[in-house]
Regions:
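RNase H-like, Mg2+-dependent phosphodiesterase core
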Residues: 1-182
Length: 182
C-alpha cells in the first residue's frame, strides 16, 4: 500500500483558511521540498505536476469554522477527511501531533524529508496562497496578496485602520491590537 503524505498551510495566520492536503504520488517528482523553502514560482510550477501524478484530497476550513471549532479540531477533522477520501493504510502527517486521530504517524519536518509530504505541502500552500490573492481583490485595504493573512506589521496596521473583516480569525488574539493602560 502506498504512503499518503499529509500537510497543512495556514495554521498560524490571523486571516484566511486552514488548508490541508493528502497525497499519494504515482511517480517520482523532481524538485519537491517543504513548500516554505521553495519559491512561489517553483511551487506554482510543481502544483499541476503533482495534480497530474498523484491521488490527492484537499480540505479547507474557513476563518469562521476555525473560530467556531478551534484550530486543533479543524486539524483533526481535516486529517479524518483525508483518511476517508484516500485509500491507504499508511498515513504520515508533518509535525508531532495526531490531534487525537488514530491510524496515522507523525514526523517532524516530514515536509522536507518525505516526497509525499512535500507534495502535500505544496498543494496546501498553493491552494491557500491563491485563495488569499483572490480575497485581496475583495478586501484590497488589507494587502492579503502580500502577507497572505499572517500578522505582519502591514497587516496589523490595516486592522487598526479598518477593523476586522469577515475572513479574520476573531479567536486569534493579537497583542498589538489589545488596548493598553498607558
Amino acid at each position: 500500500m502506498s504512503l499518503c503524505g499529509i500537510d497543512e498551510a495556514g495554521r498560524g495566520p490571523i486571516a484566511g483558511s486552514l488548508v490541508m492536503a493528502g497525497v499519494i504520488l504515482n511517480t517520482e517528482i523532481a524538485g519537491l521540498n517543504d513548500s516554505k523553502v521553495l519559491s512561489e514560482k517553483k511551487r506554482e510550477s510543481l502544483f499541476p505536476i503533482i495534480l497530474e501524478n498523484s491521488r490527492y484530497h484537499i480540505v479547507s476550513f474557513t476563518a469562521h469554522q476555525i473560530d467556531e471549532m478551534g484550530i486543533s479540531k479543524c486539524l483533526a477533522a481535516g486529517l479524518e477527511s483525508i483518511m476517508q477520501h484516500i485509500d491507504s493504510e499508511d498515513f504520515l502527517f508533518d509535525g508531532n501531533s495526531t490531534f487525537g486521530v488514530r491510524g496515522l504517524r507523525t514526523m517532524i519536518k516530514a515536509d522536507a524529508k518525505i516526497p509525499e509530504v512535500s507534495a502535500a505541502s505544496v498543494l496546501a500552500k498553493v491552494t491557500r496562497d491563491r485563495e488569499m490573492v483572490e480575497l485581496a481583490k475583495k478586501f484590497p485595504e488589507y494587502g492579503f496578496e502580500g502577507h497572505k493573512g499572517y500578522g505582519t506589521k502591514t497587516h496589523v496596521d490595516a486592522i487598526k485602520k479598518h477593523g476586522y473583516c469577515e475572513i479574520h480569525r476573531k479567536s486569534f488574539k493579537l497583542k498589538a491590537l489589545e488596548p493598553t493602560l498607558f
